[in-house]
Each structure stands twice: as C-alpha cells, then as structure tokens.
Regions:
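Structured mid-to-C-terminal alpha-helical surface segments
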Residues: 1-154
Length: 154
C-alpha cells in the first residue's frame, strides 16, 4: 500500500461561497491529480456513489490528464486488491444504495442512470484510452516483474 501521495500538496483557498459564509481560509491539501486518482480507484473498486458523482464532474470538466493518470497508476499498483479485480469489476446495483445513502446529499440531482453512465465513461477514459507504455508497465507489475522507465512523479 502507498503511504502518502504521488504529488506534492498544494495551498488552496476556500471558494467564494464558503468565504462569504465562513470567512477566508487557506490550507494545504492533496493535489487535484492525487484526489482524483483516489476517487477513480474508489469508483472502480468500492463503487461509492459519491465517487461516481465526482468522477462524472471530472470527466465532464477536466478529463484524464497525464499527471492524473500517473497518480492513478501509482495507486493501482499499490492497491491491496489485484488490478484485474478492480479494473474489470461488474457494476453493482446502485439504485438501492442511492435511495438509502445518497439522495439529498448534493445540491445537484443526479439519477442512477447518470452515475452508471459515469462508470462506463470512466472505464473508457481510464482503461480504453490508456497509452501502450502504461499498459505494458501495469502488466509487468501484475506479473511481478516491473519493467520500463515509467515516471510516476514519485
């Protein structure tokens, strides 16, 4: 398991809406790439509705950058479950979990079908669009013989 983050933390200020309500604040936080990579692994593995909600926004607004993909690869190879079990996991039924634990948590209403589509889009973006050198590296790690000079920004 990975202890820490792939990228350095960054300083962030609160949004204007939070500042208006609570006042100014600035804090050191995990990088966007590390946060998003963790959300992606969570969405693929645990399939938490919050992660699908966030991934939906990520894909619509920022996409999968090289920095994010590198962090994702680092998190995948340090994950406690086999990569194949995470990357090829069948989507569980989200309707019951949505009604029980997600409805009312967000200002924006997103139905189950949209979150299921986020899963499909995520698999296409993270796995389908993965560069060949990244694929070869993941396969070599899975075989227990890491090869290549894939720079993960560590």
């Amino acid at each position: 398991m990975l202890c820490g983050c792939v990228n350095d933390p960054v300083d962030r200020t609160v949004t204007p809406a939070v500042e208006a309500e609570c006042g100014f604040a600035e804090i050191q936080v995990i990088s966007f790439a590390d946060l998003s990579a963790g959300k992606i692994v969570g969405a693929l593995d645990s399939q938490h509705l919050r992660d699908f909600f966030d991934v939906r926004h990520l894909l619509a607004n920022d996409g999968i950058t090289l920095e994010l993909r590198s962090a994702f690869i680092a998190y995948m190879i340090s994950h406690n479950r086999p990569m194949a079990a995470v990357l090829d996991r069948r989507l569980k039924n989200l309707a019951e979990e949505s009604a029980r634990g997600f409805v009312g948590m967000t200002v924006e209403t997103v139905d189950v079908a949209e979150r299921e589509k986020a899963h499909t889009d995520l698999v296409a973006a993270v796995i389908g669009d993965m560069q060949q050198d990244h694929r070869r590296f993941l396969v070599s790690v899975q075989k227990g013989q890491p090869t290549g000079a894939l720079a993960l920004g560590c």
